[in-house]
């Protein structure tokens, strides 16, 4: 079974107004002590031999604040398998051609830029520290540094959003040479700045759904095939690391607030960077990964849920009532079902939670 390794880099310049992920804002770099703590935990999980993961993902926070030499130390300690996908999340304003070239030489072979919008006024509303000009420059620098596997993030249904804003952002990322795009609907999280003070001009839920369907249509038209609810790629550039999550493979997350599922068991690190640095944040067990998780995650994917694989893994079959519900979903245009595989359509992905409520 494949193994994905996630290394959490919580440090960032400032917290974006929509973000409720665990992070440590106000930083201009990643302390060497934090890198040493990650290395300490890596050695605990693999005391006798390297982990040899199939994928390695530096997430955050802002992982591009890492010194490339420290990224090289972490990659060398994990010793990913030959051909492993090694991803670094990056903010456009934090990188240069030289730093990207150094990350490439360290072993990073996939870069993911948080673009979100091509409009500076919107970026300011979101609390993003970069400009559209910096985003364009980051893509160009990545290509010159030797990156081919590049991804860009787009946020949908932002305040005062229009289809034209989406088109401009798609153009920026496509012109940047990115073969992968993640497109997310803005979600107002209670613990975010937007949750405490909602912005004006938010689309209604129906308008947000229309923006999502428009984005799917346009991305497909531009050659980005949808393979997951929020992810689109040209052939061969699907994100391998996240596919391990969605296929219920083994993944190990190291760092404050990082989650793992290994051998069917879930665990996580407490969301406390200082405790992690002091070696006072042991992983906490959090139940198991079971049939319900598999169903939920597989229905995020456009390939859908194989009922044969579902039965093989968990000994479960859909009941008569569940099959009748699936039939109604097909009639409503929310799903495709051939008797063996259930796959949600883009319209079905929008109401995925309601569909899951009937199937679980």
Language-model segments: residues:
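A short, conserved structural fragment
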Residues: 331-340
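Short, amphipathic alpha-helical interaction segments positioned at domain boundaries
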Residues: 347-360
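Minor-groove-contacting beta-hairpin "wing" of winged helix-turn-helix DNA-binding domains
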Residues: 341-345
């Amino acid at each position: 079974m494949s193994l994905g390794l996630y290394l959490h880099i919580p440090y960032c310049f400032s917290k974006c107004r929509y973000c409720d992920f665990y992070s440590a804002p106000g930083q201009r770099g990643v302390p060497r002590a934090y890198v040493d703590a990650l290395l300490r935990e890596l050695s605990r999980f693999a005391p006798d031999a390297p982990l040899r993961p199939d994928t390695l993902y530096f997430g955050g926070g802002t992982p591009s604040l890492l010194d490339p030499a420290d990224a090289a130390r972490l990659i060398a300690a994990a010793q990913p398998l030959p051909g492993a996908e090694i991803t670094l999340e990056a903010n456009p304003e934090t990188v240069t051609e030289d730093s990207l070239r150094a990350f490439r030489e360290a072993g990073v072979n996939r870069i993911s830029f948080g673009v979100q919008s091509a409009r500076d006024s919107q970026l300011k509303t979101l609390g993003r520290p970069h400009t559209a000009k910096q985003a364009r420059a980051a893509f160009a620098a990545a290509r010159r540094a030797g990156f081919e596997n590049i991804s860009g993030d787009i946020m949908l249904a932002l305040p005062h959003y229009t289809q034209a804003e989406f088109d401009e952002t798609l153009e920026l990322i496509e012109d940047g040479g990115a073969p992968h795009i993640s497109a997310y609907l803005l979600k107002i999280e209670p613990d975010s700045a937007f949750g405490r003070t909602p912005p004006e001009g938010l689309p209604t839920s129906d308008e947000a759904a229309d923006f999502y369907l428009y984005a799917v249509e346009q991305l497909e038209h531009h050659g980005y095939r949808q393979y997951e609810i929020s992810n689109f790629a040209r052939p061969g550039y699907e994100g391998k690391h996240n596919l391990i999550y969605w296929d219920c493979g083994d993944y190990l997350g190291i760092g404050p607030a990082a989650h793992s599922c290994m051998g069917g068991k879930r665990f996580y690190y407490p969301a406390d960077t200082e405790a992690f640095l002091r070696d006072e944040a042991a992983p906490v067990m959090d139940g198991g990964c079971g049939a319900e998780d598999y169903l939920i995650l597989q229905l995020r994917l456009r390939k859908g849920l194989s009922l044969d694989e579902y039965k093989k893994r968990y000994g479960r079959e859909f009941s008569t009532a569940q099959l009748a519900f699936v039939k109604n979903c097909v009639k409503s245009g929310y799903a495709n079902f051939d008797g063996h595989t259930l796959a949600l359509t883009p319209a079905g992905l929008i109401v995925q939670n309601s569909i899951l409520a009937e199937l679980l």
